[in-house]
Amino acid sequence: MAMKRWRSVRATPEERLHALPGDELIKEPIGSLDHAITIRRARREVWPWLAQMGAGSRAGWYSYDFLDNGRRPSAERIIPELQKLAVGMIFPALPGATDGFTVLAFEPQHFLVLGWTTPDGARLMTWAHVLEDGEHGSTRLIVRARAGPGYRFHGLPWWATKRIVAAIHFVMQRKQLLGIARRVERGAIIEMVAGEQP
């Protein structure tokens, strides 16, 4: 049996240095993590999957559902009623949660910036999903997570937080990027096959 090809989610050095939407919301981050994937479809076909993210009544995070979606499978289709966004909307982090990621900024088919803030409004982190045109009609999905000065993982000092969060984030983010790419590209195959039917 042939081994499954490893698909990279590594951001290029240029992408790591490139300013992205949402960077201005945390001007002096204490940490930043970048990942990216090339999706073989146009931006307009990737965007709906980003717009409907979130746990609980939303489409899921397309990652490890037993960890971040209460074992409920993430959606395998675009859900029209979840496509409308507004700044200030909450994407529940977990099923049943009353808090979660707040929509801080978005531009359809270009970027979605989510964030986590404290009750007093201090911004702890931002999580930007950015769509850029790639070669041959593809899309480059770049994801950047930035931590503000107050960010800590279960009260641990920053040097420990950085190592733990980087490892967890890589695992979950890789799964999400692969999950989004699979859904978008599979939709293209379904459309192609359907178009061949008599």
Model-derived features with residue positions:
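A short, structured loop/turn motif at beta-sheet edges
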Residues: 40-44, 104-109, 130-140, 182-189
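Short beta-strand segments that buttress and anchor functional surface loops
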Residues: 89-90, 112-119
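Short, surface-exposed coil-to-beta transition loops
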Residues: 32-34, 98-99, 122-128
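A structural signal for well-ordered alpha-helical scaffolds and beta->alpha junctions
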Residues: 43, 96, 173-177
